[in-house]
């Protein structure tokens, strides 16, 4: 009788401990599922305000791009106007207009000589052509028969010498300027063209990298997804498939129902085992 009593007591404690372990397992899974659901809800709530910030960042970058384009257009127009002025000074008629502007500047300051012309050029070759064309003007101003009677004003001397010096300027510029200088004078205009031609090549070199980047990202994500599926084979249930498909509402409902059914089954087992041990204990003690 004592042996039966001890065995029944041992069985009772064994069943109780076994059921407690099972209950702890199911309770842990239930807690984990609830925690995962709370994390998913927080993630969905945090994802909603992000597109507004991204739109603001995009508008800011667009404003900076407008500023860059404005500076680029300003520099391009400045260089184009400089090259146009240089080419105009090389021609005869444009040289005459340049000397007229110089005479207007001479009227403001009478102490300046008659043939002072302010020309801002970018090439040394153009500067040499302008100085070579100015020297005959000065000589013509001094040897002008109308100027022997008295000292002429700079404006009148320049106006009279312009018509006489147009032909001489054409001949002198053609004789003094070698053919290589024409290429040099055209070089400032060619440099922006070369820069513009080099810009599409840079865009073309960047485009294959941009095209290849999404492919690498896609392959990396593909391998990562396979790795996660291989590492977690228990995610092949119907409820987990619904979770991966994006049905978050069905996902939470299915997992909660499964947990409730498993908990009910474990409780039923625990009640049956307790009742069996109690029946045995009463039978033994009575």
From Swiss-Prot:
Q: Where is this region: Polymorphic region?
A: 44-212
Q: List the disulfide bonds.
A: 243-251
Extent of Polar residues compositional bias = 153-179, 186-214
5 X 10 AA tandem repeats of S-G-S-A-[GS]-[GS]-[AD]-G-A: annotated segments? 59-106
Q: What is its main location?
A: membrane
Q: Which organism is it from?
A: Plasmodium falciparum (isolate 311)
Q: What does this protein do?
A: May play a role in the merozoite attachment to the erythrocyte.
The signal peptide stretch is 1-20
Record remark: domains: The N-terminal region appears to be involved in lipid binding.
Q: Point out the propeptide residues.
A: 261-286
Write down the InterPro entries for this protein, in alphabetical order.
MSA2
Glycosylation site residues? 22, 36, 163, 235, 259-260
Q: Where is the composition biased (Gly residues)?
A: 54-68
Where composition is biased (Basic and acidic residues), the residues are 239-248
Disordered: annotated segments: 43-248
Bias (Low complexity): 69-137
What is the name attached to this protein's record? Merozoite surface protein 2
Q: Where in the cell is it found?
A: Cell membrane
The alphabetical list of record keywords is: Cell membrane, Disulfide bond, Glycoprotein, GPI-anchor, Lipoprotein, Malaria, Membrane, Merozoite, Repeat, Signal
Q: Could you tell me the gene encoding this protein?
A: MSP2
According to its UniProt entry, the protein's GO biological process terms are:
cell adhesion
Sites of GPI-anchor amidated asparagine lipid attachment are 260
- Tell me where the sequence repeats sit in this chain: 59-68, 69-76, 77-86, 88-96, 97-106
